[in-house]
Structure formats: structure tokens, C-alpha cells
From Swiss-Prot:
Residues 12-46, 80-114, 115-150 form the EF-hand domain. The gene is cenB. GO terms for biological process: centrosome cycle; microtubule cytoskeleton organization; microtubule nucleation; mitotic cytokinesis; nuclear envelope organization; nucleus organization; regulation of centrosome duplication. GO terms for molecular function: calcium ion binding. PROSITE patterns: EF_HAND_1, EF_HAND_2. Binds one mole of calcium per mole of protein. Disulfide bonds: none annotated. InterPro entries: Centrin_CML-like, EF-hand-dom_pair, EF_Hand_1_Ca_BS, EF_hand_dom. Keywords: Calcium, Cell cycle, Cell division, Cytoplasm, Cytoskeleton, Metal-binding, Mitosis, Repeat. Belongs to the centrin family. Plays a fundamental role in microtubule-organizing center structure and function. This is Centrin-B. GO terms for cellular component: centriole; centrosome; cytoplasm; nuclear envelope; nucleoplasm; nucleus.
């Protein structure tokens, strides 16, 4: 159970935090520093290097959901939904041109997600509405803001 005052957060925001944590956590059920960065970015937030250093100084190599929740919850009410989606898009692609198979595979490997190449291609095909083999920013935003089911 989360120990913080969640009055400022909606149920959807709390669910988002949990989903982000679950997406990036290791087999031990915790996030290491790299996974913390990815989970923050997926939520449209940036964690400072100072905060990561504080975690290290406390001797923590990884953090639990409750610790992650405590870290990220102050950032959530301040987010702009469009900038959140843009941050999430940037998780996948550095140059802004679009998410390719290679980008998607790299993120899957970085977060420890085992996906077959076929599954990754299916994901791209599902979101790629213009058929160019790349998920551009508008396709990504459309995917993330509509309730489609694979």
C-alpha cells in the first residue's frame, strides 16, 4: 500500500504510476537507476541527477514501488498531457523522426521485455497508420490517446 497522501492525485494518475513502475521493474520487483529514469520519462517527468545520487548515497541500488511513488508523485500534478506524450515518444527515438523497429527493439531490450521480432513488427504495423513502417509523433499520440485494443 502506498504510504503517501494521494489526495492530490486522481485514481488514473495513481494507476499510471503503477503501470510505469510495473513496465520497467526488474525481476526482483524493483527499479534500478536506469529503470527509474525510463519510468519517469514514460510518465512525462524528468528525474534529476541529484535525486539519483541521493538514492545511491542511501546505499540503494534499486527502489520499491512505494519509494518510486514517493519520488514521482510530486511531479504528476504539474505535467501537461501533451508534453507527457512527447516525453514518452522521446523514450523511443532520439532524433524525433519516428519509432522504427530498431528503436522499439532497443527499448524492449533496455527494459528487459522479451518480445519476438514478429510481435514488435505487429506493434509498429498496428500504430503506423500511414504505412511507412515508422511510428511518427502524431501516430504515437493518436495511439496513446485512443482506446484501441490489440
Amino acid at each position: 500500500m502506498v504510504k503517501t497522501n494521494t489526495n492530490k492525485l486522481t485514481d488514473d494518475q495513481i494507476s499510471e504510476i503503477k503501470e510505469s513502475f510495473d513496465m520497467f521493474k526488474s525481476d526482483n520487483g524493483k527499479l534500478d537507476n536506469d529503470q527509474i529514469k525510463y519510468a519517469f520519462k514514460a510518465l512525462g517527468c524528468e528525474i534529476t541527477e541529484e535525486t539519483l545520487e541521493l538514492i545511491k548515497k542511501k546505499g540503494q541500488k534499486s527502489i520499491s514501488f512505494n519509494s518510486f511513488f514517493e519520488l514521482v508523485s510530486p511531479y504528476i500534478p504539474k505535467r501537461d498531457s501533451m508534453s507527457t506524450l512527447e516525453q514518452a515518444f522521446k523514450l523511443f527515438v532520439k532524433d524525433g523522426s519516428g519509432i522504427t523497429f530498431k528503436d522499439l527493439k532497443k527499448v524492449a531490450i533496455n527494459i528487459g521485455e522479451e518480445c519476438s521480432d514478429s510481435d514488435l513488427y505487429d506493434m509498429i504495423e498496428f500504430a503506423d497508420t500511414d504505412g511507412d513502417g515508422v511510428i511518427n509523433k502524431s501516430e504515437f499520440i493518436s495511439l496513446m490517446t485512443t482506446k484501441k485494443v490489440l
